[in-house]
């Protein structure tokens, strides 16, 4: 094909992708009595009566809420790179955030998260959850997973989630030895969940690493501002 200047033009073929709001679940041809249904799932050896994982965000998941989620049959994932592993009295920190106004928010959050992660508090939070008989799932970012995930497992964590906005099996960095999920799985020896991803290829490569679960989807949730400020957000469903 030639453009108006007589020069050859090349076009890249793109596929249509859909957000969750574009996809509907269509009822099938068979119905079943509610008392005969079973929504339970297993992650490794751990059974969840309801297939719900609560987000590993400081604004969502606290040790207390993780305990309640487990008691209700779901799973609450605690972020152990946030306020719960930086402060002994996290209730005071939450109160400061809640009572701040919009003009203070950015500076306050930068101040709060400037404090270092304390490995001894990782063990304290895990014990806090385990002492109530709850399943303990904890979350780390890929850059800290090799250092902190073994600490959490030694403290009694039942499941480990490695999560970033976008996570891939292959990653370019200045590090000579990057994060290898196959190796990490052998080290922690507990169910390993990884996310997030939003493409078939990335999902397949992560699953081939031997992980136990995959988190699919990259925004735009209630806490995501990409769509608001850029009018762009990753789509999470494709048709082939």
Name these PLM-found stretches:
Residues 128, 132, 142-188, 201:
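Hydrophobic, small-residue-rich alpha-helical packing segments that form membrane-like cores
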Residues 1-129:
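N-terminal capping/small domains of soluble enzymes
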Residues 229-234:
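Conserved small/polar residues in nucleotide/adenosyl-binding loops
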Residues 77-86, 161-168, 215-228:
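Glycine-rich phosphate-binding active-site loops on the catalytic face of alpha/beta enzymes
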């Amino acid at each position: 094909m030639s453009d108006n200047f007589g020069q050859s033009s090349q076009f890249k073929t793109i596929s249509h992708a859909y957000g969750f709001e574009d996809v509907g679940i269509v009822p099938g041809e068979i119905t079943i009595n509610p008392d005969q249904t079973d929504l339970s799932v297993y992650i490794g050896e751990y059974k969840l009566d309801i297939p719900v994982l609560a987000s590993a965000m400081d604004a969502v998941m606290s040790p207390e809420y993780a305990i309640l989620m487990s008691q209700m049959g779901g799973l609450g994932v605690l972020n152990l790179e946030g306020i719960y592993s930086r402060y002994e009295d996290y209730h005071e920190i939450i109160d400061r955030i809640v009572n701040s106004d919009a003009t203070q928010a950015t500076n306050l959050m930068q101040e709060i998260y400037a404090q270092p992660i304390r490995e001894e508090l990782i063990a304290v939070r895990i014990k806090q959850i385990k002492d109530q008989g709850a399943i303990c799932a904890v979350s780390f970012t890929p850059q800290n997973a090799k250092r902190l995930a073994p600490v959490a497992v030694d403290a009694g964590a039942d499941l480990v989630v490695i999560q970033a906005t976008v996570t891939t099996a292959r990653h370019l960095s200045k590090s000579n030895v990057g994060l290898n999920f196959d190796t990490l799985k052998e080290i922690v020896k507990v169910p390993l969940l990884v996310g997030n991803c939003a493409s078939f290829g990335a999902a397949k490569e992560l699953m081939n690493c031997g992980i136990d679960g995959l988190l699919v989807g990259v925004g735009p949730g209630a806490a995501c501002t990409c769509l608001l400020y850029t009018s762009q957000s990753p789509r999470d469903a494709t048709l082939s």
